[in-house]
């Protein structure tokens, strides 16, 4: 995703998953 620097993070997760 674009919100966090760690792909698969809980913040990144809602936008990718």
Curated annotation (Swiss-Prot):
InterPro entries: Pea-VEAacid. Pfam families: Pea-VEAacid. Keywords: Neuropeptide. One of its GO terms (cellular component) is extracellular region. One of its GO terms (molecular function) is neuropeptide hormone activity. Signal peptide: none annotated. GO terms for biological process: neuropeptide signaling pathway. It comes from the Eukaryota. This is Peptide hormone 3.
